[in-house]
Regions:
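Nudix hydrolase/Nudix homology domain
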Residues: 2-22, 27, 49, 86, ...
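Short beta-strand micro-motifs in enzyme catalytic cores
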Residues: 37-41, 86, 137-139
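Acidic, metal-coordinating catalytic segment for phosphate/diphosphate chemistry
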Residues: 26-63, 69
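Unchanged
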Residues: 51, 60-63, 68, 94-181
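Conserved Nudix-box catalytic region and its N-terminal flanking loop in Nudix hydrolases
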Residues: 2-8, 19, 53, 63-108, ...
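Active-site/binding-pocket entry motifs
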Residues: 44, 81, 147-148
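Short glycine/serine/proline-enriched coil/turn segments at secondary-structure junctions
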Residues: 33, 82, 130-133
Length: 199
């Protein structure tokens, strides 16, 4: 799969990178946590002037669309403390380390959260939720040829799993009922693949 971050020949990127790219002058770490680090960087802008960037550094994550032959998808309902509400999301989780194999992480998170085992995993590309301040790269996958296994939730995980038709999820996205960005992005890609006969 071509990487749109580095491949200018994909037909979308037209600007000269030199006209847009910022370069780091120095970096200062303010906080190191279990999930993310907080840094402040001084950078040089394309016009040569200095500026400052406040950044959240994250080790990365994966998210999976478990698609059954009847075009239903296993999704989760989970309370998200940061936004104070229950969200509908696809199975997802952070990497154990920045260099962890992402496919293995996707298979692990799918199995732990839903009990599902994927016979086939297809990469859908990467998703950046808030690239102005966070470097978290979420790699999205489509899981098919599913079989049942056993869930193994972490001690601090509380979620319910159910199957919803892909078409109903599309309607819910249009109604604004699925505000989670990675879930919107991954489901939209799968819907396009279905429309184009790719799956």
């Amino acid at each position: 799969m071509k990487n749109p971050d580095t491949d200018k020949q994909n037909g979308l990127f037209q600007a000269d990178p030199a006209d847009l790219t910022e370069s780091k002058i120095e970096s200062r770490r303010l906080f190191s946590g279990a999930v993310f680090d907080l840094e402040v960087d001084r950078v040089k802008l394309p016009n040569g002037k200095p500026s400052k960037r406040e950044l959240i550094r994250h080790k990365g994550a994966v998210a999976v669309v478990p698609l059954f032959p009847d075009r239903t998808v296993a999704v989760e309902e989970q309370f998200r403390y940061a936004v104070g509400r229950i969200l509908i999301e696809i199975p997802a989780g952070k990497l154990d380390s920045p260099d962890e194999d992402r496919e293995e992480a996707a298979l692990r998170e799918l199995r732990e959260e839903t009990g599902l085992i994927a016979g086939k995993l297809t990469c859908l590309g990467d998703y950046f939720g808030s690239p102005a301040i966070v470097d978290e790269r979420i790699t999205l996958y489509l899981a098919t040829e599913l079989s049942e296994g056993e869930r193994s939730l972490d001690d601090d995980e509380f979620l319910s799993v159910r199957r919803i038709p892909l078409s109903d999820l599309a309607d819910a996205i249009l109604r604004g009922e699925i505000p989670d960005g990675k879930t919107q992005a991954a489901l939209s890609r799968v819907m396009l693949m279905v429309e184009r006969g790719q799956i």
